């Protein structure tokens, strides 16, 4: 990933459906994303590297509720939107890697069997 000199616009976080937690969360994530230097010349390896980095950074914990090791008591669609928007701003591949992790884990925690949820 090439470091960006652009600054992610965050004015929209003043909209009433975002709360103070979202407003505090977004710049932390933006700083983290800007600090990642993942070589994306091999997209398959870069996806693995992004998943590792997202996991190590704790960002994948937003894909499941706290009862399953997640960051928040329940899935927060607004936090997920901020995550995806911010990652995509810095690297579309980072957003893709995050989305692929969340698609399965989020659905399983919402509608999976007890056995699936414990895995």
PLM-predicted stretches and their roles:
Residues 18, 43-47, 117:
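Residue-level recognition of alpha-helical structural elements
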Residues 6-8, 34, 59-64:
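Short acidic (Asp/Glu) and glycine-rich catalytic loops that position anionic groups and cofactors
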Residues 25, 31-32, 112-116:
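Long, well-ordered alpha-helical segments
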Residues 57-118:
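Internal helix-loop-helix
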Residues 1-25:
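Intrinsic disorder at enzyme termini
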Residues 6-8, 43, 52, 99-100:
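Short hydrophobic/aromatic segments of transmembrane alpha-helices and their interfaces
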